[in-house]
Amino acid sequence: MKKGRGLALLLAGAILPALSGCLLPPDAPSVLASAGGTGPDDAYVVYSVEQEYEVLRLLGLRPERQSLHIIDGRAFDVIIATNPETGEARDVWFDISRFFGRL
């Protein structure tokens, strides 16, 4: 085995297990498929404000108003959003506990 290849394998063996604990947040389509966003027990779990707006975009909704709710120690954004084609408004719940209040 070449010296450089052995070093690469050694480094990979040390780095890959360490990185296995680093999980990326799910993408917006995965978030969308995981819940319905109809209330605190069915809220979309998101990892950023940008992800909230990406979910709204995928739903075809336009945000109108937003409010913060703290329920049982969990933080939720409730966005009243409108379907631009029908004018129908609905509340969309997002669980923002994973990033709310963190720098």
Each predicted region: which residue ranges?
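C-terminal motif of bacterial Sec signal peptides marking the signal peptidase cleavage site
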Residues: A18-G21
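Short, compact, well-ordered microdomains
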Residues: L68-L103
